[in-house]
Amino acid sequence: MSKNTSDLSSHTPMMQQYWRLKNQHPDQLMFYRMGDFYEIFYEDAKKAAKLLDITLTARGQSAGQAIPMCGIPYHAAEGYLAKLVKLGESVVICEQVGDPATSKGPVERQVVRIITPGTVSDEALLDERRDNLIAAVLGDERLFGLAVLDITSGNFSVLEIKGWENLLAELERINPVELLIPDDWPQGLPAEKRRGVRRRAPWDFERDSAHKSLCQQFSTQDLKGFGCETLTLAIGAAGCLLSYAKETQRTALPHLRSLRHERLDDTVVLDGASRRNLELDTNLAGGRDNTLQSVVDRCQTAMGSRLLTRWLNRPLRDLKVLEARQSSITCLLDGYRFERLQPQLKEIGDIERILARIGLRNARPRDLARLRDALAALPELQEAMTELEATHLNQLAATTSTYPELAALLAKAIIDNPPAVIRDGGVLKTGYDAELDELQSLSENAGQFLIDLEAREKARTGLANLKVGYNRIHGYFIELPSKQAEQAPADYIRRQTLKGAERFITPELKEFEDKALSAKSRALAREKMLYDALLETLISHLPPLQDTAGALAELDVLSNLAERALNLDLNCPRFVSEPCMRITQGRHPVVEQVLTTPFVANDLSLDDNTRMLVITGPNMGGKSTYMRQTALIVLLAHIGSFVPAASCELSLVDRIFTRIGSSDDLAGGRSTFMVEMSETANILHNATERSLVLMDEVGRGTSTFDGLSLAWAAAERLAHLRAYTLFATHYFELTVLPESEPLVANVHLNATEHNERIVFLHHVLPGPASQSYGLAVAQLAGVPSAVITRAREHLSRLETTSLPHEVAPQAPGKPSVPQQSDMFASLPHPVLDDLAKLDLDDMTPRRALEMLYTLKTRI
């Protein structure tokens, strides 16, 4: 199809209508309603057929060309939409809004909804345990305004961020499925490397119009009440988001009631690398198994799980909030009160998203049935909440209201097990509306009328093979075999000829058809009108209902954390004002669940006298586990949770950094070592004396001297910054750091060898490791025994011939390269001698190349 569709005169009327709508949405797939199917045309059809693995065919011709087409049944659209959304596609839903019986030309069609990955609300298209976020960003390299919206809950927030680095870290945290940026931004910016980036017109971000639309949405004169009146960039981004949401939903958004101003200074910041390394809610393979959330999430509701995920990804530095959560968990543990609450919370379900769909006016009948059941369960839950003494739990109880009138209305209106959609009726109870009952009675009694009519006609005509039936195309009919058609009475009017049969209509049957079909269509229309009125009633109660949902989600998280504290042997950490991090018998919460043997717990102590631990020991000895468990304990403490330790005393931290493991960034053109150095640079630039830093094997991706020098200098820098640092290394030379840096101490993970086999003991002990056990680990990994034997020979020779291991402490501030055993010092090569004698200044390029080839042959 030609890309130029501005001249539609050569197209058929149907295709003219299609292109008028399609030209408004050139970059989105259009589902075009044709009877019982959504049909997809032209380039959209080719793309959809490939993505959905459905047949590509053709639908006649228009403008002299065949029309590529594929289609799906309208009643099965959800599954196909879910697949497209997961693939990052956006879909325009175009429905028939006119009456085919009265339409002249093509039936009128309109775009009723645009489904994009960030604005879907249908239950079938969403992951119930994860937020589905869309974000918009505005600004320059110095300052950015970021707005974030979850249309499935109504959560709407803004913040302003300094610099690309912090912006990208925040985007990594929230992980939006769509990101809106101004169309006048240059191409190739860092944010565009993310999935789902969509460019919007610059005027969509204009501050004054954004401010006006936000005030209209929230029915306020200004945004001062939300604390964001002066956030010019963030307001522009929020205005763009609101406009996009309205454009895609094609309806009012009453469930968007407020704007929350978030501040990075209130949180513990984790960059993208740290978030990935700690495997908070996604493991390194992209799954959810063996993540922190997989261990600490036993929430009874999906909305509780989503809130817990937010907490894990946004630890707080607000001591008042953290201590309120701790007190709540303690209260819920007292007398095992959480055990009474959790079954009741399970009855509540995911009312947060149900209420959002009600606000969007696309709630399904089963949504209302679930809301009915939740409202019925509220009084008993509220009664249980009143028995809780903790101040914060009392506040949640006060926010949780009961709604007896709404509960009674829904109980009266919705049948016990309603169908999935309102379209075919059968949702509202008999007795809810007298007029609907009358219409349904007339329609439903049609079957008995047809049975009686068939019996009467058989008796009247004497034709035993006579049948009375109905189909959607031709309506009601009397059918006779072709051989008996000539015996039909005179009042039988021929309606349809089939192979082997004739169909007729009689005046009596025609009169009934008019009444029955009219009654059915009027009943469906009446039921849809009553259902919409029910939604409007619920929408008028949205604000308190949403507040209740928010309170119950938090109660679910706190009850869950109490249950986890009991069953995982977690204890309450204590925040103190003096700088310290003291953990007794700390454990890795994920690893200990996977092990079939008891986990070896370890202590940690950092304070003003010791700010860095240099950790040595064998591979697989537990260094990385020890470091990660420290970070996870600190993180859990900063969401208000109890922690996997016998005791924990710590001061608030501002950031958690990890430099653990690396892989190539092939798409970005960065090697493993480059990735490692980028992460190290980020830490050295941004760590403070309140940061927790984990550094594992820094410098291993380059030559020995380069790597050692970089690791040494990085460790010195962190010691001078006074950051809480765990520095794991195989460079034994670094164990002399405490001699020049008084805030540094050595610890090691112990192991022992028995019959040339290594046994890892996993205990963290003071002082440096005595040896590395590298060959024993290689043997354990299955390296061939011949290779191990040969390696032992090389090791013995190198240990004998190398220079003694000796490093002189260097005064701070003086440039130095740490000295190390030069394992090749006793192995001179004649090529090196010849190379040193060459006079490169007097050598022509050709001669240099010839010499290079000659030297190469001698290596």
Swiss-Prot record:
Disulfide bonds: none annotated. One of its GO terms (molecular function) is ATP-dependent DNA damage sensor activity. CDD domains: ABC_MutS1. The keyword Secreted does not apply. InterPro entries: DNA_mismatch_repair_MutS, DNA_mismatch_repair_MutS-lik_N, DNA_mismatch_repair_MutS/MSH, DNA_mismatch_repair_MutS_C, DNA_mismatch_repair_MutS_clamp, DNA_mismatch_repair_MutS_core, DNA_mismatch_repair_MutS_N, DNA_mismatch_repair_MutS_sf. GO terms for biological process: mismatch repair. ATP binds at G617, P618, N619, M620, G621, G622, K623, S624. It comes from the Bacteria. One of its GO terms (cellular component) is cytosol. Pfam families: MutS_I, MutS_II, MutS_III, MutS_IV, MutS_V. Residues 801-820 are annotated as: Disordered. The keyword Phosphoprotein does not apply. Keywords: ATP-binding, DNA damage, DNA repair, DNA-binding, Nucleotide-binding. This protein is involved in the repair of mismatches in DNA. It is possible that it carries out the mismatch recognition step. This protein has a weak ATPase activity. Belongs to the DNA mismatch repair MutS family. PANTHER family: DNA MISMATCH REPAIR PROTEIN MSH1, MITOCHONDRIAL, DNA MISMATCH REPAIR PROTEIN MUTS FAMILY MEMBER. This is DNA mismatch repair protein MutS.
